[in-house]
Regions:
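Structured, helix-rich domain cores that form ligand/interaction pockets
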Residues: 1-129
Length: 129
């Protein structure tokens, strides 16, 4: 969609903030932390970051149990409040520098990012600026 708008209007559209929540789905016999580590690796690979560039923080905010920093500015929060569908919520947040880091580090477009989180991870965008 962004590519279409840019092409139609002849202007470059910049995303300066993106936040999305998505469910953490666990099977009965799965250990939460193992699933979380796999999910962090999966998201890191999509964003084109090495495992050494993903750091687990000692704290988290907004009632999430785990928080990771991907690169310098991309925040991933996991295992948050329980959703109506019985799963725990997760959140990805890219502020200004995180948005630029995504654009500069990846060969992917914003449409790729939206598709990954909204379709593949069944996410719900909470804010796009």
């Amino acid at each position: 969609m962004l590519q279409y708008l840019e092409h139609q209007n002849g202007v470059k559209i910049a995303v300066d903030y993106f936040s999305c929540t998505f469910p953490l789905k666990l099977q009965e016999d799965e250990l939460e932390l193992i699933v979380i580590e796999d999910l962090v690796k999966y998201i890191g690979e999509f964003l084109n970051f090495e495992p050494s560039e993903i750091n687990k923080e000692e704290y988290s905010t907004n009632r999430f149990r785990y928080q990771y920093t991907i690169g310098n500015s991309i925040i991933l929060r996991l295992s948050g409040p329980e959703l109506l569908i019985g799963y725990r919520s997760c959140q990805i947040e890219l502020k200004g520098q995180g948005c630029r880091e995504f654009e500069n580090r990846s060969n992917k477009t914003w449409n790729d990012l939206f598709s990954f989180f909204l379709m593949r991870l069944h996410g719900n965008p909470t804010r796009i600026d």
